[in-house]
């Protein structure tokens, strides 16, 4: 296969593939994290808080990165997935972030516009700065209780996303 045109690119693509991504936006965000030298990147990381399980898109150490697309706040009738008013979806998202970050995790948020053009470089710098703050506050290593809970959730809970 070494002489097939494009085989080197195909091998790189396969090496970067991750079945945990739930959207192209998550895949592009994960690729940005890899390009920034952050890693390893864990996809769909479960955080169990107060009897609820919240699934974070991406995790590097104690830092989470969430990709935010508008589809989660747009109604089903308008091509989205939200079955509740946008105000309720956004309010729940805020409560979710507060609960997750209360467990000793930092978080960055990324949207489509952050992944292209001049904003991509600025987003990379912002994520590196936010990740550095998380490392300073919480260290590099995921606390054992979070790692243990995540392992248990992954073994016993079917993967489920809510809008």
What do the predicted segments below correspond to?
Residues 1-163:
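Surface segments flanking catalytic/ligand-binding clefts of nucleic-acid enzymes
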């Amino acid at each position: 296969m070494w002489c097939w045109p494009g085989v080197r690119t195909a091998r790189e693509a396969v090496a970067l593939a991750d079945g945990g991504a739930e959207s192209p936006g998550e895949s592009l965000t994960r690729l940005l994290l890899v390009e920034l030298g952050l890693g390893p990147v864990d996809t769909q990381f479960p955080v169990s808080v107060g009897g609820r399980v919240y699934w974070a898109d991406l995790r590097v150490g104690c830092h989470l990165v969430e990709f935010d697309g508008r589809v989660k706040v747009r109604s089903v009738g308008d091509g989205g997935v939200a079955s509740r008013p946008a105000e309720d979806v956004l309010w729940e998202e805020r409560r979710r972030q507060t609960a997750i970050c209360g467990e000793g995790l930092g978080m960055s948020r990324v949207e489509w516009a952050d992944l292209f053009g001049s904003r991509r470089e600025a987003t990379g710098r912002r994520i590196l700065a936010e990740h550095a703050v998380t490392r300073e506050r919480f260290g590099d290593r995921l606390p054992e209780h979070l790692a243990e809970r995540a392992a248990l959730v992954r073994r016993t809970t079917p993967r489920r996303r809510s809008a």
